[in-house]
Amino acid sequence: DTVNAA
């Protein structure tokens, strides 16, 4: 899984 938070 890939999670990006900005």
Curated annotation (Swiss-Prot):
This is Unknown protein 5 from 2D-PAGE. It comes from the Bacteria. On the 2D-gel the determined MW of this unknown protein is: 15 kDa. It comes from Fructilactobacillus sanfranciscensis.
